């Protein structure tokens, strides 16, 4: 049996290509609007913010650091005898009884001097990659867009599946 797209001689939506096309159109609009021959005008590229244009490809860059307020608010947990045999996944040293450690939202435990340098570089748990919020607005917007695209793709797959059941 032919697929819906074969029957109607059309291509499925490609959110990445659509986003890239929209980004290029926006770049062209900004280039046209930013170009100025007025005396004292600055360089075209000094006037444009490539992050605002969405030209930072977060899929191929490391995520930004975790938000400072979020890191400071992570719960500190005191190790009790029942958890004393656990080890810090970064330094592999066993936690000592009555030692204070940092607990991530994913419930992984770390020594503060092991996890804090990590979170100053990236926003995720080193074990499971659970992401913490960042102070980078463009990255947060990228995460929301990615979730919307995944939801749209899921709805499209459900719709397509419902047509043939």
Swiss-Prot record:
| GO molecular function annotation | ubiquitin protein ligase activity; ubiquitin-protein transferase activity; zinc ion binding
> Which is a Gene Ontology cellular component entry for this protein?
cytoplasm
The catalytic activity of this protein is classed by the Enzyme Commission as 2.3.2.27
- Enzyme type, top EC level: transferase
Keyword set includes Transferase: yes
**UniProt PTM:** Auto-ubiquitinated as part of the enzymatic reaction.
InterPro entries of this UniProt entry?
A: Znf_RING, Znf_RING/FYVE/PHD
Q: Pathway of this protein?
A: Protein modification; protein ubiquitination
Task: Please indicate which superkingdom the organism of origin belongs to.
Answer: Eukaryota
The alphabetized list of GO BP terms reads: protein autoubiquitination; protein ubiquitination
Q: Which UniProt keywords apply?
A: Metal-binding, Phosphoprotein, Transferase, Ubl conjugation, Ubl conjugation pathway, Zinc, Zinc-finger
Q: Which SUPFAM superfamilies match?
A: RING/U-box (SSF57850)
**Zinc-finger ranges (RING-type):** 88-129
PROSITE patterns of this UniProt entry?
ZF_RING_2
Task: Provide the residue span(s) of the region labelled Disordered.
Answer: 136-165
Where are the Phosphothreonine modifications? 165
Give the Gene3D superfamilies listed for this entry: Zinc/RING finger domain, C3HC4 (zinc finger)
- Catalytic activity from the UniProt record: S-ubiquitinyl-[E2 ubiquitin-conjugating enzyme]-L-cysteine + [acceptor protein]-L-lysine = [E2 ubiquitin-conjugating enzyme]-L-cysteine + N(6)-ubiquitinyl-[acceptor protein]-L-lysine
The UniProt similarity line reads:
Belongs to the RNF181 family.
- According to its UniProt entry, what is the function of this protein? E3 ubiquitin-protein ligase which accepts ubiquitin from an E2 ubiquitin-conjugating enzyme in the form of a thioester and then directly transfers the ubiquitin to targeted substrates. Catalyzes monoubiquitination of 26S proteasome subunit PSMC2/RPT1.
How does this polypeptide assemble, per the annotation?
Answer: Directly interacts with ITGA2B and, as a result, with integrin ITGA2B/ITGB3. There is no evidence that integrin ITGA2B/ITGB3 is an endogenous substrate for RNF181-directed ubiquitination.
Supply the name of the protein. E3 ubiquitin-protein ligase RNF181
Q: Which organism is it from?
A: Rattus norvegicus (Rat)
